[in-house]
């Protein structure tokens, strides 16, 4: 029976299931696919949570943001909001910006979302603080509530009188006061300033009574505008000075009284009365007929006295010091302003007088009388110094052609302590070839064109000629006007200096023109002397050049440069000295010339002369002696220097070589220093075996000794070579002595003994070295 009942129950359940509608359910995966499809078709807008398990619509996100803002009392940070809602921060930033555009009651401040209710509650809290303290700073509020000062300032001003009961100082918007606080300080300020009787610094009042600075200035301005204080304020803020009216009236009365009695008043007097701007004060206090000077104000009476004195000066050729007419407080600057801007400007005779030293007034007639005192001196002096128009001191040449002067080497003199100057370059004056008489144009080089050029040069260089120095002019004036002040005479002398100079130059020019013929003969003599010197030096230079042909490579280059830097440079200096005298009209000593002065002189030469002289100058810095000789031939030619160069015959050449050898022998016999002794012996041996003169520096002696090896016996060469090595050791040890000691250990006496031994050997072998050179001489 029970089985049947069970069957019936199961049949009933089956029938009920068949009759019941089925409910279809989707899996989570199917849901995700459907939503993804809808998003792709733009049918729905949703955003994922950070864990990706939930979706939010934009509307739901906004509702949750507003709910969280409400829960956090109207202020929440966006980072904190992102953590609560569990949505990416970019979605929250985007939605908040959208909410800010549509809702003006929301603010985004420093990453915090704030609503208007929060600001209202904040204003109520600020009001409580204000009422408790009486004043409050907006910047302090910003630090307290972590909000920008500008944001707080704007919202506080909007709620002033509604939530906040106080006022903002217009001079200091960052501070808020209560009405009671302002009224209390206004009463104190009115009381303090009412008691002041003399000018007082407002900053000192602020410091003494601890008033708020901005509030005090605002209240003080209102009290003065409302006439509740009898006074005035000069300056602004920290430099403001309060002056009561009673003090101002006393000042004004004193100023007017002093001016009426003295017809002037000093600015310093007003400064001592605490008047900060005396000029503007006097413009308001005095009438318009006063004269404002540098240190004081003058009236019309003083001006009238000065004008009367000027009229007397015009009437009689005299002068006046107006400082004697002015009150003692007047300065020289005051006198200058009074004269230049008032007296002389309005005086009808102002063209007849001059103002000197800002205080002297002198008539032009008086100056003309002083000028005539020097007429008798001019012609006499011009006749004595007329040659100064042609020649300038040699010491001025360097200053004329170069900005700085330098020491000039003397290339023809043997310096025993400088190995760059060689005994081989020394010669006697008698060794120079004798000059021959000039022919053709060289005989008389002064032409009418030369005279015109000289006259033109004189016109251009008048500034080099002075009549008298200012102290000398003052002495003459003192003898004639002993009653005049020294300062006045100094100024008169300065006025006379230029007119006297111009007049004297005209007198000197006339004297010069009368003396042209004598000057021309002197120029011919200078040209002749230069020609003789150049011929002698050039002959020696060419003979030395032959000696260079026995060398090659670095030795040839070094010897060539040395010859260019010594004899060739000396020749160039003589040529440039001659050109300077001809074309620049100054007398220049060849020994005073250097590369700088020569380069400066080149710029002043005519173009054709400049080109040839530049080539000559450039050849000195080269290596080729023949290039120098070619450039020299162009400069010495008939178109420029007109120097005749004599050809050297064999007989004269042998005589010069013989004289040069005799000179070396004479020097060798007198020489006692080892290095110079070896130098002279080497030059003698070279000349003996090559029949050529050599002009060599000390650093080339080893190369010459190497060259002589083939001409000497082994014993002679060994002796000379060993002597050379001893000299090198001696020089090295001398250099070591000059180095600073690096240690404090006691010196070993071996070094000093070595030095003595080397010196002793050098002295002992010197006789042998000399004998080698002289024996070779005898064998010849």
Curated annotation (Swiss-Prot):
GO biological processes: protein ufmylation; response to endoplasmic reticulum stress; reticulophagy
Listed Polar residues bias regions: 403-413
Region Disordered, residue ranges: 403-458, 734-760
GO molecular function terms listed in the Swiss-Prot or TrEMBL record: UFM1 ligase activity; UFM1 transferase activity
Residue ranges with Basic and acidic residues bias: 443-458, 736-750
Keywords: Transferase, Ubl conjugation pathway
GO CC annotations, alphabetized: endoplasmic reticulum membrane
EC number: 2.3.2.-
Superkingdom as given in the UniProt entry: Eukaryota
Principal EC category: transferase
Function field: E3 UFM1-protein ligase that mediates ufmylation of target proteins.
Family: Belongs to the UFL1 family.
Descriptive protein name: E3 UFM1-protein ligase 1 homolog
Organism: Trichoplax adhaerens (Trichoplax reptans)
Classification of source organism: Eukaryota, Metazoa, Placozoa, Uniplacotomia, Trichoplacea
């Amino acid at each position: 029976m029970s089985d049947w009942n069970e069957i019936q129950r199961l049949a009933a359940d089956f029938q009920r299931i068949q009759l019941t509608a089925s409910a279809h359910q989707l899996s989570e995966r199917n849901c995700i696919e459907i939503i993804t499809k809808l998003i792709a078709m733009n049918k729905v807008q949703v955003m994922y949570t950070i864990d990706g398990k939930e979706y939010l619509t934009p509307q739901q996100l906004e509702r949750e943001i507003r709910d969280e803002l409400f829960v956090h009392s109207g202020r929440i940070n966006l980072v904190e909001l992102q953590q609560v809602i569990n949505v990416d921060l970019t979605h929250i930033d985007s939605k908040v910006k959208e909410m800010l555009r549509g809702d003006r009651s929301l603010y985004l401040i420093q990453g915090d979302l704030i609503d208007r209710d929060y600001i209202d509650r904040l204003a109520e809290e600020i009001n409580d603080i204000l009422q408790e303290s009486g004043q409050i700073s907006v910047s302090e509020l910003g630090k307290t509530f972590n909000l920008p000062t500008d944001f707080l300032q704007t919202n506080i001003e909007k709620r002033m009188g509604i939530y906040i009961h106080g006022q903002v100082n217009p001079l200091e918007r960052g501070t808020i006061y209560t009405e009671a606080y302002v009224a209390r300080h206004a009463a104190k300020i009115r009381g303090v300033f009412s008691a002041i009787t003399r000018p007082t610094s407002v900053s000192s009042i602020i410091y003494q009574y601890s008033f708020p600075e901005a509030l005090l200035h605002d209240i003080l301005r209102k009290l003065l505008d409302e006439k509740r204080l009898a006074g005035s304020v000069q300056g602004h803020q920290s430099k403001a000075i309060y002056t009561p009216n009673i003090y101002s009236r006393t000042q004004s009365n004193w100023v007017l009284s002093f001016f009426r009695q003295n017809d002037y008043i000093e600015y310093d007097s007003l400064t001592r009365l605490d008047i900060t701007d005396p000029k503007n004060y006097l413009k308001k206090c005095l009438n318009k007929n006063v004269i404002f000077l540098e240190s004081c104000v003058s009236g019309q009476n003083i001006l009238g006295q000065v004008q009367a004195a000027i009229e007397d000066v015009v009437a009689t050729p005299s002068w006046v010091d107006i400082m004697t007419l002015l009150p003692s407080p007047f300065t020289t600057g005051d006198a200058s302003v009074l004269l230049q801007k008032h007296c002389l400007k309005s005086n009808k005779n102002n063209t007849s007088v001059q103002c000197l030293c800002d205080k002297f007034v002198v008539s032009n007639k008086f100056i003309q009388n002083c000028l005539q005192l020097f007429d008798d001196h001019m012609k006499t002096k011009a006749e004595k110094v007329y040659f100064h128009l042609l020649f300038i001191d040699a010491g001025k040449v360097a200053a004329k052609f170069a900005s700085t002067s330098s020491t000039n080497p003397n290339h023809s003199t043997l310096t025993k302590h400088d190995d760059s100057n060689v005994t081989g370059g020394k010669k006697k004056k008698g060794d120079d070839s004798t000059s021959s008489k000039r022919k053709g144009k060289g005989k008389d080089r002064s032409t009418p064109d030369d005279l015109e050029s000289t006259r033109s040069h004189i016109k251009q260089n008048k500034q080099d000629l002075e009549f008298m120095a200012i102290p000398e002019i003052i002495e003459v004036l003192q003898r004639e006007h002993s009653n005049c002040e020294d300062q006045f005479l100094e100024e008169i002398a300065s006025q006379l200096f230029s007119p006297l100079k111009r007049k004297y130059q005209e007198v000197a020019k006339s004297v010069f023109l009368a003396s042209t013929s004598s000057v021309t003969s002197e120029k011919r003599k200078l040209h002749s002397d230069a020609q003789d010197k150049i011929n002698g030096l050039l002959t020696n230079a060419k003979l030395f050049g032959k000696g260079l042909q026995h060398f090659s490579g670095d030795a040839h280059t070094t010897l060539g440069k040395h010859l260019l830097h010594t004899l060739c440079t000396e020749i160039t200096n003589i040529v440039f000295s001659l050109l300077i005298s001809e074309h620049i009209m100054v007398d220049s000593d060849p020994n005073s010339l250097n590369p700088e002065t020569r380069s400066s002189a080149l710029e002043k030469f005519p173009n054709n002369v400049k080109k040839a002289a530049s080539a000559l100058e450039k050849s000195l810095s080269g290596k080729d002696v023949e290039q120098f000789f070619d450039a020299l031939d162009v400069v010495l030619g008939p178109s420029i220097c007109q120097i005749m160069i004599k050809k050297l015959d064999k007989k004269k050449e042998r005589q010069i070589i013989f004289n040069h050898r005799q000179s070396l022998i004479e020097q060798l016999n007198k020489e006692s220093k080892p290095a110079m002794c070896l130098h002279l012996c080497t030059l003698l041996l070279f000349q003996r075996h090559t029949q050529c003169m050599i002009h060599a520096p000390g650093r080339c002696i080893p190369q010459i000794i190497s060259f002589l090896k083939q001409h000497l016996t082994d014993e002679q060469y060994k002796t000379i070579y060993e002597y050379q090595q001893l000299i090198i050791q001696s020089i090295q040890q001398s250099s070591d002595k000059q180095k600073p000691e690096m240690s404090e250990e006691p010196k070993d006496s071996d070094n000093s003994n070595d030095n003595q031994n080397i010196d002793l050997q050098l002295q002992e072998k010197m006789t042998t070295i000399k004998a080698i050179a002289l024996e070779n001489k005898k064998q010849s």
